[in-house]
Structures are given as C-alpha cells and as structure tokens.
C-alpha cells in the first residue's frame, strides 16, 4: 500500500481539477480503504469544497464482523455538507448510530439506463430471478406451482424443484429475455423473511430496477426498503412469503397483468433515463449551495 506521501501525491493527481469552493459528490465506499477515503476528504476540506457523500453501502452494517468500525464511518460521514442515503430505513439507522448531518437526501431506487428496443411483455404465469443460486441457495429447492426461471449457472439441482436455469447472460440479453413477459422476483438470502439479515432492508435492490426497466411487474418482500414505493405505484406485489408470491401469480388474470405492465411501462421510462440519480444529485447540489 502507499506511504503517506505517495497517497498524498496520488490524491493530488486525482483532485487536480477540483477548484476552491467546488461541490464534490463522493460515492462511498470506494473500497480503497478508510485511510484513503479520509485523506481524500481532508484534502477537500483544505479546498473548502462542498462535500456530498453518496452512501452506496455501509461496510460495518454489510459485514457484522466489521461493526466495530461504525464510529469511524459515522465520523467520516459527519464531515459532509450533505449525504445521500439509499433509503429512509438507512437514514434512520445512521441517525441512531450518531449521524449529525442536517441535509440528508434519500435515493429510493437505482436507475437502469439502456438503449435497445425491448419486447412488449406478454402475460405468462412464471417468475424470473436474476442472481447466483450460490448466493441464494434456497431458490434451488423452489417447489411452488409457479415455474421459476433463474439466470444463473445450474447448481446440483433438486429433481422435485420447479426451476429452470438460464445461465449467465449479458445485461442487454437479460433485459430482452425479461421483457418477453412474466414477473421478476426480488428476495433475500433466506427463504424465511424473519431470518433475513437487517442489511437487506436498509439498502436498495438492483434487481427490482432491472425487472422494472425490462417492463415487467415485480414481486418483492415486505421488508424491502422500497416496497412501499412499489405498492404505491402499482408496479407489482408486496408479499410476506414465497408461497404467497406463487399464489398471487397463479391467481393473476391477463387483464390484471396488462394493467400492471402499463403502469410499469410509464415508470420504467424514469429508470431508463436515469431520473432517480439525476434528481437526487441535482437536489443535493441545490441543498449545499442554498
């Protein structure tokens, strides 16, 4: 790793274009280590720059074994003029941990920009899951009535499971396949929501943005940080179990599906155009300049 002087020289190069009093958006973590991040922030302070910290993930909450580092992260966040947090739940958690920044903005949703023509989703009673079965092993035993298609290499499969594996595909291919019709499943690493680690209810899922960008409705667990947004805009269904998820798909009519798809179509335009990122960044700049 760099010595203090080497790191300082490297940061001077990275920050060469930052002028006195500029607004700087700093996305954390950089995964370069806390020493790097703190040194970067200290140099910004010398330039009297306005610092907006865009909190993507919080390592001490992501990894319980790192929780002892929480005070150091809070101290780093507290040097910001404004912070952007993924969710209201994360805001409340960080405030409880000692966050004192007055200007806190909530991201709520990831965008999913793309530039390719997609299919018009057709009614199909099936669920998609985009994610590695290695990380979500309980899905390999899916035995509900609704078929589940998983975009992941096949693991040792359970012959009783109602699952098919689609392998890894590129991002454009994934959007094209999803857009043919069906519903996208967002779920945590545990089958039973009561066993789910707290973090999954604090951050925001990239999966929900992927499915919605593809134009298909989503089924999400009630503990998901933006479940209320999905319910409020009628973009799919909020459930408390996988059994309930399957039951909803089995009882869904073609008319209900198409009505939901129409709502998703309007919403997906925002994700395609990067609306959520643009809005929260513009709002953050306005906050620190006002």
List the model feature ranges, each with a label.
Residues 2-92:
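Extended catalytic core of nucleotide-activated donor transferases of GT-like folds
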Residues 85, 220-221, 239:
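Short beta-strand scaffold positions
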Residues 89-91, 134-135, 225-226, 244:
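Alpha-helix capping/helix-boundary segments
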Residues 172, 176-213, 220-228:
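Nucleotide-sugar-dependent
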Residues 233-239:
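A short acidic/histidine/glycine-rich donor-binding loop in glycosyltransferase catalytic cores
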């Amino acid at each position: 790793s760099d010595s203090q002087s080497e790191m300082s020289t490297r940061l001077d190069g990275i920050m060469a274009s930052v002028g006195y009093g500029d607004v700087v958006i700093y996305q954390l973590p950089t995964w370069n280590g806390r020493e790097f991040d703190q040194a970067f922030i200290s140099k910004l302070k010398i330039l009297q720059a306005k610092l907006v910290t865009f909190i993507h993930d919080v390592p001490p909450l992501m990894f319980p074994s790192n929780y002892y580092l929480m005070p150091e992260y809070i101290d780093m966040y507290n040097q910001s003029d404004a912070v952007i947090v993924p969710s209201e739940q994360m805001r409340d958690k960080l405030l409880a941990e000692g966050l004192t920044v007055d200007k806190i903005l909530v991201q709520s949703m990831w965008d999913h920009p793309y530039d390719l023509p997609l299919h018009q989703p057709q009614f199909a009673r099936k669920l998609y899951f985009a994610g590695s079965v290695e990380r979500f092993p309980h899905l390999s035993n899916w035995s509900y009535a609704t078929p589940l298609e998983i975009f992941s290499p096949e693991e040792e499969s359970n012959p009783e499971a109602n699952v098919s594996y689609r392998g890894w595909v590129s991002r454009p291919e994934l959007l094209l396949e999803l857009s043919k019709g069906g519903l996208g499943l967002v779920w945590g690493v545990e089958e039973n929501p009561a066993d789910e680690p707290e973090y999954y209810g604090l951050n925001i899922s990239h999966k929900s943005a992927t499915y919605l960008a593809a134009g298909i409705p989503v089924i999400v667990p009630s503990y998901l940080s933006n479940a209320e947004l999905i319910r409020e805009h009628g973009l799919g269904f909020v459930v408390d179990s996988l059994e309930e998820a399957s039951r909803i798909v089995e009882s869904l009519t073609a008319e209900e599906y198409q009505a939901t798809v129409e709502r998703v179509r309007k919403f997906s335009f925002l994700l395609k155009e990067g609306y959520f990122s643009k809005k929260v960044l513009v709002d953050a700049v306005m906050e620190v300049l006002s």
